[in-house]
Design a protein with these regions (language model features):
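Radical SAM [4Fe-4S] cluster-binding motif and immediate context
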Residues: 1-146, 164
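Pocket-edge positions in alpha/beta enzyme catalytic cores
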Residues: 27, 121, 151-154, 215
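Residues in well-ordered alpha-helical elements
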Residues: 33, 127, 156-160, 221
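Histidine/acidic-residue-rich catalytic or RNA/ligand-binding cores of hydrolases
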Residues: 64, 159, 188-189
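Catalytic cores of alpha/beta
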Residues: 92-95, 152-168
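Conserved beta-strand->loop/alpha-helix structural units within folded catalytic cores of enzymes
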Residues: 136-146, 151, 165-177, 236
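Glycine-rich beta-alpha loop elements in corrinoid/cobalamin-binding modules
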Residues: 178-184
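Radical SAM enzyme core and accessory elements
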Residues: 186-261
Length: 261
């Protein structure tokens, strides 16, 4: 496997999504020169791959562009991946990302319902999401789309539209996750107030797919059923299977693909 490490260029998140605690942390970023010093040390260790673990890489575009241009000037030769937001991605930013070694981006989509996006303060439009995935494809940057199943206010038809959007965006990978009322979020407060919380381990973020919220629209069982349906519909398309078989290069890619099931 390629030697890999993670790097933080910023801490916290400038976004205020109601289902996430990262926005509660004061957003701070490191000076690009400080990050470059760390990357210089990393290169001496033989590391080839970087995972920038920022909640939103390049949230401050001025600092992000400066860092990536410094990476290009230093000719580190790293390939890298990061989490970012659809609203950040422009042709200019994607061009610098690609030139500095970016080969994949993780992008939160959450839902195809614009009303739900607004309700939970996502701060991104469906049009921006479509543009972001199109831009990534144009620049040869692979994408992982993140989707939430079962946000309060959603109907089954909304979830089906979200699944359809994941296919329309033509993500290289899609991660379908059930809504989780994490302590400290507005989503948690809403769930408790309306008695939507599944009391058993409802506050525990254990990384499982167990549904934690039950609203008047969708039962816990239905949420899990729709999550499984989403995975099957996205990953078992003949065209997708053929594309992945052609592109798979090693065991780790195969393992990550099957982890969704």
């Amino acid at each position: 496997a390629t030697p890999l490490t993670s790097v933080l260029t910023s801490y916290g998140c400038p976004a205020i999504c109601s289902f996430c605690v990262a926005g509660k942390i004061n957003y701070q970023y490191r000076a690009p020169s400080n990050v470059i010093s760390e990357l210089e040390t990393i290169k001496t260790l033989g590391i080839k791959e970087i995972f920038f673990r920022d909640n939103v890489f390049c949230a401050n575009k001025k600092q992000g562009h400066l860092l990536m241009n410094m990476m290009i000037e230093n000719d580190f030769g790293f390939s890298w991946v990061a989490d970012t937001r659809a609203s950040i991605l422009t042709d200019e930013t994607a061009k610098i990302m690609k030139k500095s070694g970016c080969h994949a981006l993780h992008i939160g989509v959450e839902t195809a319902n614009p009303i739900i996006l607004k309700k939970y303060n996502k701060g991104v439009t469906i049009a921006e999401i479509r543009d972001a995935f199109r831009i990534c494809k144009n620049w040869g940057i692979k994408t992982v789309g993140y989707f939430i199943i079962g946000l309060p206010g959603e109907m089954v038809e909304d979830i089906k539209k979200t699944i359809d959007l994941s296919i329309e965006l033509d993500c290289d990978y899609a991660s379908f996750n059930v809504a989780l009322p994490i302590i400290g979020t507005e989503l948690r407060e809403e769930a408790v107030k309306n008695n939507w919380v599944n009391s058993k381990n409802s506050s525990k973020y254990d990384g499982s797919f167990e549904p934690k919220i039950e609203s008047e629209n969708i039962s816990l069982e239905k949420i899990l059923e729709m999550r499984d349906f989403a995975v099957r519909k996205f990953y078992l398309r003949p065209s997708y299977i053929v594309k992945q078989l052609i592109s798979l290069r090693n065991f780790y890619q195969v393992k990550s693909l099957f982890n969704e099931f």
